Amino acid sequence: MQTLAQNLTSQGVNASLTQLIHTLANTSKEISHAVRHGALAGVLGATEQENVQGETQKKLDVITNDMLKDALKGDDTVRGLASEEEDYIVEVGDKGEYLVCFDPLDGSSNIDINSLVGTIFSVLPAPTGELSESSFLQAGRQQVAAGYVLYGPSTMLALTTGQGVQLFTLNPETNEYLLTTEAMSISKDTGEFAINMSNQRFWEAPMQTYISDLLLGTIGPREKAFNMRWIAAMVGDVHRVLSRGGIFTYPTDNKNPQKPYKLRLMYEANPMSFLVEQAGGKASTGYETIMDIQPSEIHQRVAVILGSANEVDACLNYHGLDYSEEPQL
């Protein structure tokens, strides 16, 4: 099996990006160690702080954020970083070639129940001139690398540099990432969907109708049985989609009119969309392709529909219908 280093060399990834990927990968090994030790290390539970999203921070949110921030500050290829747990961008150096956006511990609410969590990251080119928040506001198409690390029964790194999606598994004996899937591929059709059904009453009419038709199975207009899956961590649900197909969505809802969207564009939706597209899938908000969105702020949120290409298209067809004459759902 190829090591991560050997694989990056075989793909012709440049030295600077290779160095940055190794920094992220090596830090993920430390995070994996902290996650595995859980209560033994006293890292479970919540802090008394909230992040910029207004969400109560878990202890491991803060710990993993600091681990990544410190590691990236020590990497001379990094110009600046943005994190879910940081109110503002963090300037690292004036000569780095890259900007890094990350969610240090996606699904952190799962920590206390010993369920799946992960790290998501996006790498963008650093523009010349003075660094500011606007330096980070690049469409997803500008990403030069993206990936996630899944901390589950085994620790796995899914990575793209624009040459497909490679999956690496951390060997606990050697502490090295080894290539276990050379090219992840999402099937075009699927019989699985992932959505938080508890929000059903808050969805827009297109998503209400789409999910209702899936639930009708063989007796409904889709004439096909579907199974629902939900891990409550984007990193876990998207990993399943990349592994065996499916559609994952966190759609627009009116549960909180001030926050109609849940997932963050820069460090959740964009990197996952890059991975999904590189594996042959599609990613949309329901009305526009996610990686074509011009960001307006670092912590911007968007609706997300991604996964098997034909099923995403089917969902988008519902969003193109006229619901003006339908009764209130």
Swiss-Prot record:
It is found in: Cytoplasm. It catalyses: beta-D-fructose 1,6-bisphosphate + H2O = beta-D-fructose 6-phosphate + phosphate. One of its GO terms (molecular function) is magnesium ion binding. Mg(2+) 2 binds at D103, D106, E268. Pfam families: FBPase, FBPase_C. Substrate binds at D106, G107, S108, S109, N196, K262. InterPro entries: FBPase_C_dom, FBPase_class-1, FBPase_N, FBPtase. Pathway: Carbohydrate biosynthesis; gluconeogenesis. One of its GO terms (cellular component) is cytosol. Mg(2+) 1 binds at E84, D103, L105. PANTHER family: FRUCTOSE-1,6-BISPHOSPHATASE-RELATED, SEDOHEPTULOSE-1,7-BISPHOSPHATASE, CHLOROPLASTIC. This is Fructose-1,6-bisphosphatase class 1. It comes from Shewanella sediminis (strain HAW-EB3). The lineage of its organism: Bacteria, Pseudomonadati, Pseudomonadota, Gammaproteobacteria, Alteromonadales. The gene is fbp.
